[in-house]
Design a protein with these regions (language model features):
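Hydrophobic alpha-helical segments and their helix-loop junctions in multi-pass secondary transporters
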Residues: 114, 163-194, 253-260
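Membrane-interface loop-to-helix entry segments
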Residues: 131-183, 215, 238-243, 360
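Hydrophobic transmembrane alpha-helices that form the core helical bundles
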Residues: 34, 52-139, 143-147, 296-316, ...
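Membrane-interface "cap" regions at the ends of multi-pass membrane proteins
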Residues: 1-60, 65-69
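Hydrophobic, membrane-embedded alpha-helices of multi-pass small-molecule transporters
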Residues: 9-27, 46-47, 135-138, 195-259, ...
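Helix-loop-helix connectors at the membrane interface of multi-pass transporters/channels
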Residues: 2-4, 77, 104-133, 167, ...
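Transmembrane helix-loop boundary segments of multi-pass membrane transporters
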Residues: 30-41, 115-128, 150-162, 290, ...
Length: 360
């Protein structure tokens, strides 16, 4: 039993999907849809100057240190010393811990929209106690799956990434194409400027948010020792993931902007509303609860990827002697159980995430 977790290997496709689920969150599409055609400029610009260079560096460092575990802790530590390596993995871990409530709130909204009564669904989605309960349930479910080891994490992340992110994104894009091809009215002006006006502060804010959208492609480096032939397969997985990410963001944003008027875009609920509008157009409203369930599953997969990733890097820090023995404890299959438990407690006990949820 002790060696089960160590013998599991990730294939190119599984790691690519894990990278996509770590980076892509469909909940962010409404925020960019309000900027129309110029949103594509931001996506492509950020991909060229941030996503692709980050992916190249991650692929190179993962291949260089394929026999050493730790991800950014190892990469930064080898170049600048273990103290800065610890700082790098700590920042990655703590920012993901604070980020969980944001993405999990979208999961709660998705579950609320499983019903067919949209006024009631919206009322439930805005209930802060319902949201808090769902956030904690999804997060701890992800934690317990992580405790089952990399085999479970890989399978759930791959299936969840396909069912909850890639397939819904592809469906959204196809629905947008069908809508336009059959004479549907586009709420997005495709004759507007592709290049944004940088004299407006709002456009600078959007540029910053797009860079944040692409954060996380390096996180897969944590699992480099768990990849078959990492020097060859890890770079493949990174670039496949990067390509899928850009396509989903650009075309998905367009599809959402086409079906929802700019004035009606809501950052939390518009993705579900967009699907609802498309389904009504093709007379298939019965698909709305199904897509809501799929999106909630996608949230679980995305959170699972981050729960299992940076915590493993913190575990590598502990094994290097920079944390007390308590942080080095594992379960019988070698999973960093104490770090996962502490991470879960921080989600609720930290004032920022908890107060943010209860103040909705």
């Amino acid at each position: 039993m002790a060696n089960i977790n160590k013998t599991v290997k990730l294939g190119v496709f599984t790691l690519a999907i894990m990278n996509v689920t770590a980076v892509v969150s469909l909940r962010g599409l409404p925020a960019e849809a309000v900027y129309g055609l110029s949103s594509a400029f931001y996506y492509l610009f950020a991909a060229i100057v941030f996503l692709i260079p980050t992916s190249l560096v991650a692929a190179e460092l993962a291949a260089m240190f394929q026999d050493k575990q730790g991800g950014v802790f190892r990469w930064v530590g080898e170049a600048y010393g273990k103290r800065l390596g610890f700082l790098a993995i700590w920042v990655q871990w703590i920012e993901s811990t604070i980020w969980y409530p944001t993405v999990l709130t979208f999961g709660a909204v998705s579950i609320a929209f499983i019903g067919m009564d949209h006024p009631e669904d919206m009322l439930l989605a805005n209930n802060k106690y319902y949201t808090l309960a769902i956030v904690l349930i999804i997060y701890w479910l992800a934690t317990f799956i992580s405790l089952k080891g990399l085999s479970w994490v890989g399978k759930v992340a791959k299936i969840g990434g396909m069912v909850g992110t890639i397939i819904p994104a592809a469906l959204l894009i196809i629905l947008g194409i069908v809508y336009l091809a059959t004479g549907g009215h586009s709420n997005m002006d495709f004759h507007s400027n592709f290049f944004p006006d940088f004299s407006k502060f709002d456009n600078l804010v959007l540029a910053a948010s797009i860079f944040l959208f692409y954060a996380g492609m390096e996180m897969g480096g944590i699992h480099v020792k768990d990849v078959d032939n990492p020097s060859k397969n890890y770079p493949k997985a990174v670039f496949i993931g990067a390509l899928i990410t850009v396509v989903i963001f650009v075309l998905g944003t367009f599809a959402l902007g086409i079906i929802i008027p700019e004035k009606d875009i809501n950052l939390t609920q518009s993705l579900l509303v967009g699907f609802d509008n498309y389904f009504k157009y093709i007379h298939a409203s019965w698909l709305s609860p199904i897509i809501a369930i799929a999106l909630a599953f996608g949230v679980l997969a995305g959170v699972l990827t981050w729960v299992a990733g940076p915590s493993k890097g913190i575990f590598a820090v502990g094994k290097a002697g920079y944390l007390p023995p308590f942080f080095q404890k594992t379960n019988k299959i070698g999973v960093q159980k104490n770090i996962l438990y502490i991470q879960g407690c921080l989600l609720y006990t930290s004032p920022s995430p908890r107060d943010g949820l209860l103040s909705r």
